[in-house]
């Protein structure tokens, strides 16, 4: 696929955290059982003045700062989220003014559950490869929803990642891409509903594992890769168990997966989930390292990518931008009452 690839990346994780044991305490669940079930110790919580827009803006600013890139050279902006503050009003157009981009930019919000942000990656790559734009940006950002007392509440969290793609200054070249999708009713949220629903019988084998495994195997078969070719492997992380099992099924050893695991510390950031693991790996990769990234979105589909780190990776890593590891350590714990307030889940009624 030529020299098109990731020029820069930026991530943002809200510093607030709520421990799994605190949520379990409120609902009378056994905290040890819940932690063992999901392998999520705590999750990130957006501040009371944060939403998917502010998270996307901060991640995108960090991506631009890392490459010292003139924002007016960005010709396309894609945003993937399940947490739009507005039913009808794009986040991508807000980014144009917030980041100082040109008004002559292709901008759109995308939707495919948790893989919309990574779908924007391919759209941006396509425009760059065609010569229509010099650089493109895709952002995955969410303040994901989980109904109080329902098991999604233990993992649904907040965060964002932005990727800039182009031909010049590439830090991680995109070598291969492959997709696998089908109509699978594993997870949905109807219009006007504040919380999603999920068909528990569909979330494992028919949805996540079928699509993730087929996308990864399809990519390796189509391009001739072997598990031993990859220095790192990153998967969508709805919980701590699924990506580990996916890697085992693909005969990828844990030492290649563990560096990209973030769900244990921040939960499932939905559109930023696999991308956050990818950003964490980019923070530490060496020139020549090949990185397998497999995203997943309910409904359902997976995209698999292979990136190869270039000699510019070290220069990008040395930029004055917070690493994912640093953000994982920078945290303030809140209790359940503060969590409800910050997530605006306490409703006031006028009489």
From Swiss-Prot:
Positions binding CoA in this chain are 241
Q: Where does (3S)-3-hydroxy-3-methylglutaryl-CoA bind?
A: 30, 114, 155, 203, 236, 245, 268, 298
Name the EC number(s).
2.3.3.10
Gene Ontology MF, one: acetyl-CoA C-acetyltransferase activity
Note the Pfam families from the entry.
ACP_syn_III_C, Thiolase_N
Q: Which Gene3D superfamilies has this protein been placed in?
A: 3.40.47.10
Q: Which domain of life is it from?
A: Archaea
Decide whether keyword Acyltransferase is in the record: yes
Q: Which residues form the active site?
A: 82 (proton donor/acceptor), 114 (acyl-thioester intermediate), 236 (proton donor/acceptor)
User: Which example biological process does GO assign this protein?
Assistant: farnesyl diphosphate biosynthetic process, mevalonate pathway
What SUPFAM superfamilies does UniProt report for this protein, alphabetically?
Answer: Thiolase-like
Swiss-Prot/TrEMBL keywords: Acyltransferase, Isoprene biosynthesis, Transferase
According to its UniProt record, which reaction does this protein catalyse?
Answer: acetoacetyl-CoA + acetyl-CoA + H2O = (3S)-3-hydroxy-3-methylglutaryl-CoA + CoA + H(+)
Pathway the protein acts in? Metabolic intermediate biosynthesis; (R)-mevalonate biosynthesis; (R)-mevalonate from acetyl-CoA: step 2/3
The record's listing under CDD domains reads: init_cond_enzymes
Instruction: Give coiled-coil spans as residue ranges.
Output: none
Per the record, the similarity remark reads: Belongs to the thiolase-like superfamily. Archaeal HMG-CoA synthase family.
Q: What does it do?
A: Catalyzes the condensation of acetyl-CoA with acetoacetyl-CoA to form 3-hydroxy-3-methylglutaryl-CoA (HMG-CoA). Functions in the mevalonate (MVA) pathway leading to isopentenyl diphosphate (IPP), a key precursor for the biosynthesis of isoprenoid compounds that are building blocks of archaeal membrane lipids.
**NCBIfam families with a match to the protein in the record:** HMG_CoA_syn_Arc, PRK04262.1
The record describes its quaternary structure and partners as: Interacts with acetoacetyl-CoA thiolase that catalyzes the precedent step in the pathway and with a DUF35 protein. The acetoacetyl-CoA thiolase/HMG-CoA synthase complex channels the intermediate via a fused CoA-binding site, which allows for efficient coupling of the endergonic thiolase reaction with the exergonic HMGCS reaction.
Q: What is this protein called?
A: Hydroxymethylglutaryl-CoA synthase
The taxonomy runs: Archaea, Thermoproteota, Thermoprotei, Thermoproteales, Thermoproteaceae
